[in-house]
Amino acid sequence: MDIWITTDWLYIAKSIHQPKYKFLHQWGSELNEAAEKEIISLNSAEPEIENVNPNERTILVFDDVMLEKQTPIERYFSQGRHSGVDCFYLCQSYFRIPKQCIRDNANIIILFNQDAKNLRAIHDTFVSGDMDFTEFRKFFSECMTACKHAFAVIDLTREANNGKYRSQFDKCYI
């Protein structure tokens, strides 16, 4: 696993050689140079949460790490909030993410196109108290046709009538 660290950003990915990470690294380097901060590249070692400065906002992006050891990642999800850490866990299958520490500590779920089985499970887990499955399917279908890289948002910090369900980030459903 490769890792880049700045004072304010941490990107963790299984394969940093991908074009998107090369772009992100270049962009981050330019940003850090302007902010007089440094990016450090590490291999196969997650920094300890105790080393994160709680006085600065830190963003951690975990991408394509579902098959990696989850214990260090789980620590960030369960304890990171208290140290000013915001975590993003990017994966292809929501229900393969460890439940107790990662899924249960999620505030916002962003969904790209889903098959019927996963859509039903997401509905049953997060949505069933607010709308029936037919309405949820309609909402999801509208989200998926909104633009080229469409997605649906379920914001678990909000009420159903106050932006909990959105198409992209800006269009509330209920």
Residue ranges and their predicted role:
Residues 1-138:
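Conserved P-loop NTPase motor cores
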Residues 53-54, 144-146:
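Extracellular/periplasmic catalytic domains that process cell-envelope and extracellular macromolecules
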Residues 134-140, 155-160:
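A general structural signal for short secondary-structure boundary/capping elements
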Residues 145-174:
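Conserved P-loop NTPase motor module
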